[in-house]
């Protein structure tokens, strides 16, 4: 009852289109959710992502939640997640994808959900790691432990958003360490 009154005077709005959210909607309205270009890689063993990494790394499974298009809805939401402090977007995406991934047999043997870490300087600037809530939501839905200490960023690299896929791979190989203790 009280939450209904709060919503009446301070309605929540969609992170994508800014329209008011209905009571059952969380962060993103139904209309915008249906516009998101879902990749459905988790139902295809041989998909775009797996082919992109073929011959570069040993990959047993690869999937992505959405297709990314420049100036598209996904880019806008990721920008708000990373730079505008809307961490709830990550949690919602993680919950949606966690539900989808429950049907993937190979993930039942996964040891951890591991987020890509930020360097301490960038973490202080942003205030949080934008993939933390995504990873925690995946972890909860898949019942796989969340581990944010095993992968460590050694260097504070410049933003890679304008670099090619292959250049990002080169940079990443020397940027991270694994700590097993």
Task: Place the predicted regions along the sequence by residue.
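Glycine-rich phosphate/pyrophosphate-handling loop used in enzymes and phosphotransfer proteins
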Residues: 1-181
């Amino acid at each position: 009852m009280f939450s209904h009154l709060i919503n009446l005077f301070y309605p929540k709005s969609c992170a994508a289109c800014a329209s008011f959210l209905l009571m059952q909607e969380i962060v993103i309205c139904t209309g915008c959710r249906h516009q998101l270009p879902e990749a459905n890689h988790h139902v295809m063993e041989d998909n775009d992502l797996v082919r992109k990494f073929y011959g570069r790394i040993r990959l047993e499974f690869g999937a992505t939640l959405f297709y990314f298009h420049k100036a598209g809805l996904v880019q806008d939401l990721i920008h708000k997640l990373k730079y505008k402090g809307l961490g709830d977007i990550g949690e919602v995406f993680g919950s949606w994808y966690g539900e989808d991934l429950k049907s993937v047999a190979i993930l039942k043997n996964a040891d951890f959900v591991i987020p890509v870490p930020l360097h301490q300087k960038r973490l202080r600037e942003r205030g949080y790691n934008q993939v933390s809530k995504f990873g925690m939501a995946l972890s909860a839905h898949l019942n796989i432990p969340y581990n944010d200490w095993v992968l460590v960023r050694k260097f504070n690299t410049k933003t890679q958003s304008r670099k090619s896929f292959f250049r990002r791979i080169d940079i990443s190989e020397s940027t991270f360490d694994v700590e097993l203790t």
